[in-house]
Regions:
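A positional/architectural concept
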Residues: 1-47
Length: 47
């Protein structure tokens, strides 16, 4: 299990976001509240 993820937000969907870390894109399924705080192209830390 992954406990945290830090990287660049490369895509934001209706129920998930893709965060790129060291060249690997991770799809993170999360709440609408968390998705609303993410900005495409900026760094994010998801816990």
């Amino acid at each position: 299990m992954i406990a945290s993820l830090r990287g660049t937000v490369i895509n934001i969907g209706l129920s998930s976001a893709v965060i790129e870390c060291n060249g690997v894109g991770y799809e993170v399924v999360t709440t609408p509240n968390t998705l609303s705080q993410l900005v495409r192209g900026e760094e994010a830390l998801v816990l």
